[in-house]
């Protein structure tokens, strides 16, 4: 949650209002865990906007933080392959995993159980049916301070917030926003990010791929070499340009303006998408999201994108930018990709001033991470 010591300070009131909107949307459908420097103040802010039923779904834990991009420092979860599964791996990564059976099967009925008393007691009885992978986060290649953010996983785990086995992978830098997993053995990523300076050098791309396969239980890593948005200081996270959806569908960012400096790179990305296949050799159904009209902050272009949506139980929360035609097209395409799900647009113009959006701010956890009662 943003506070006075984060980069959000110059527009703290505006971003807090946006965070409250996101919290309300999530808590309406599923449990919500918030890490906050000032939990009492956050609780008071939420109580002004959330219903009593929504507040019942909210748990707030005191944690100091450098920034607010939970996607990149939070645990990446592995769940065991279903009994009788034909997937020849130990488990499946669920950083984002729509499946043929439905959207985010790992998240349906997701519950984080909390009761009054010493939370540490729960850690002793946690349901150990999942693995919580704790990779090193170094502020996107040592661009920004990350010491406090790097402690949040351990702090919450020690307090019994999450069940399962914590696996320490501090020897490898990996951000949640840099990968997309279908839960069936395919992981999407970008070479511009994973091979960027100050992450895992001097490892080669082949060596990085082997680590990803072993630790994420993946059968195939699909690398994209194009599509970094102007203003994206993560070096090109996949969750800003290409997203996995049900039925082997990909929502991706396209550009029609040949005068846009991003046009050639996004066109090259589109060509790669057309020939990409999953771990079973199946091609993807492609749905092309519009590019928002350019947004600027102090003359610098911001990485506005509709691809940075968040999938929750029964809904998809989509960033919008007060651009009537583009917003409507994007929401309609997300609805086409996620039939049966509520589509919720949230104005993300304040969020993108810090070069991210809704998916970047959040991390989902599967039902298998719930604590034993």
Regions found by a protein language model. Give the residues of each.
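Intrinsic disorder/low-complexity segments
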Residues: 82-127
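The feature marks the mature, well-folded catalytic cores of soluble enzymes
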Residues: 1-84, 107, 123-373
């Amino acid at each position: 949650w943003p506070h006075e010591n984060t980069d959000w300070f110059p527009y703290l009131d505006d971003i807090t209002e946006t965070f409250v909107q996101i919290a309300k949307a999530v808590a309406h459908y599923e449990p919500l865990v918030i890490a906050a420097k000032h939990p009492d103040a956050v609780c008071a802010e939420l109580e002004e906007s959330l219903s009593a039923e929504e507040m019942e779904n909210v748990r707030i834990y005191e944690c100091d933080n450098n920034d607010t991009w939970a996607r990149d420092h939070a645990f990446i979860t592995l769940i065991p392959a279903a009994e009788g599964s034909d997937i020849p791996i130990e488990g499946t990564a669920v950083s984002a995993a729509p499946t043929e059976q439905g959207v985010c099967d790992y998240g349906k009925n997701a519950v984080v159980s909390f009761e009054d008393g010493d939370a540490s007691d729960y850690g002793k009885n946690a349901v150990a049916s999942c693995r919580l992978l704790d990779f090193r986060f170094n502020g996107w290649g040592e661009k920004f301070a990350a010491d406090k953010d790097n402690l949040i996983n351990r702090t919450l785990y020690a307090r019994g917030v999450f069940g399962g086995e914590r696996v320490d992978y501090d020897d490898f830098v990996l951000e949640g926003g840099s990968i997309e997993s279908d839960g069936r053995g395919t992981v999407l990523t970008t070479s511009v990010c994973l091979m960027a300076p100050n992450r895992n050098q001097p490892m080669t791309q082949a060596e990085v791929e082997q680590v990803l396969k072993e630790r994420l239980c993946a059968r195939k890593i699909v690398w994209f070499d194009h599509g970094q948005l102007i203003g994206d200081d993560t070096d090109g996270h996949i969750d800003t340009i290409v997203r996995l959806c049900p039925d082997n569908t990909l929502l991706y960012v396209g550009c029609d303006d040949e005068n846009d400096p991003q046009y050639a790179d996004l066109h090259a990305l589109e060509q790669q998408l057309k020939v990409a296949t999953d771990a079973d050799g199946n091609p993807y159904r492609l749905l092309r999201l519009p590019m928002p009209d350019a947004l600027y902050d102090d003359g610098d272009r911001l990485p506005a994108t509709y691809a940075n949506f968040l999938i929750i139980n029964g809904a998809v929360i989509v960033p919008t930018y007060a651009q009537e035609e583009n917003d409507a097209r994007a929401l309609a395409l997300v609805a086409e990709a996620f039939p049966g799900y509520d589509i919720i647009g949230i104005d993300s113009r304040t969020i993108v001033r810090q070069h991210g959006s809704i998916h970047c701010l959040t991390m989902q956890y599967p039902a298998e991470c719930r604590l034993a009662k």
